[in-house]
Design a protein with these regions (language model features):
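Long, C-terminal-biased catalytic regions of enzyme "large/alpha" subunits
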Residues: 1-186, 193-211
Length: 211
């Protein structure tokens, strides 16, 4: 930016299809290259996200991701993958607030899996058949930035979905208080030395401060 006068941003690419496509081509050209799901359908972990089977503890994942995602200047997100919707809007609000108060990453989602029956509509969680009529359903999950029926995903994203550990909010443990938490101790202000001068009226005026 200083050299050319142009503006640049650092962005986490979504890679809805390239996570599989590039891994497949790389594996064909370089058989020894490391990809996710060694020995099977290859894919790359999206952007700088954790491996999809890393942990069921959402706060353990956030502890790692918060250090990375705050380095981006645009286009980054942490997806809180849930097996099914939370029991109430109050539960969702409490989780959103806890993340906001204790982490600094700019954007996150609550992403439950759900199913749709053509006869009976919305079903929570992954239910491949309708418990009421027995018809085959469509299971929806967030492929990356948007929801789509899992049956329409490419082979790599389908494998990722199979290996994905969904976060268990009930057993997740927050191990620290972040800077915005109400009980967090405020950082001590640095000692400041004021540089003063007198203006034409004789009043003192602060020119600048320094530590």
């Amino acid at each position: 930016q200083e050299l050319y006068g142009d503006l640049y941003n650092l962005e986490a690419t979504p890679a809805e299809s390239t996570a599989y496509r590039l891994a497949k081509h790389d594996k064909a050209r370089y058989p020894d290259i490391i990809t996710a799901h060694e020995g099977g359908t290859p894919y790359y972990t999206n952007s700088s996200h954790l491996p999809v089977g890393y942990t069921e503890d959402v706060f353990a994942a956030l502890d790692v991701q918060d250090k990375l995602q705050t380095l981006y200047t645009s286009g980054t997100v942490f997806h809180t993958f849930l097996g099914e919707k939370l029991p109430s809007w109050q539960s969702a609000a409490a989780l959103v607030r806890k993340i906001a108060e204790n982490y600094e990453l700019p954007y996150y989602t609550l992403s439950p899996t759900y199913s749709i029956c053509t006869e009976h509509g919305y079903l929570k969680g992954e239910q491949k058949t309708c418990p009421i009529c027995g018809k085959t359903t469509e299971v929806y999950s967030r492929i990356t930035g948007y929801y789509r029926p899992v049956q329409n995903w490419n082979a790599g994203k389908t494998q990722e979905y199979k290996e994905r550990k969904e976060y268990n909010i009930g057993t997740s443990v927050l191990k620290h208080k972040g800077p915005l938490h109400p009980e967090a101790k405020p950082e001590q202000e640095p000692a400041v030395e004021e540089e003063l001068c007198k203006n034409s009226t004789g009043k003192r005026k602060i020119l600048f401060t320094r530590e």
